[in-house]
Amino acid sequence: MTTFIFFGKYTMEGLKGMSAERTEDAIDVIEKCGGQVKEMYAVLGPYDLLFVLSFPSTEDAMKCSVFLARMTGIAFTTAPAVSVELFDQMMSET
């Protein structure tokens, strides 16, 4: 499974539907797309949400990002991520 960071930015539409129930619905969508939730944060700064998720493929992560945006009205930017330990190992091999 590959780790992906989903950066979420609330839209006006997305702000209207905020609820614990919608969070549970989002987790269901993530799992239906083959994903696993590692962490979910509300943050301050250029983004409002930060999700750390795992997916079997990039295609699954992309599909989930679009499904979540349609369902919630939240704009997501999605990026693959590796641990610092793996990054250090990769750099030692170059």
Short names for language-model regions:
Residues 1-94:
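A compositional/biophysical signature of low hydrophobicity enriched in polar/charged and small residues
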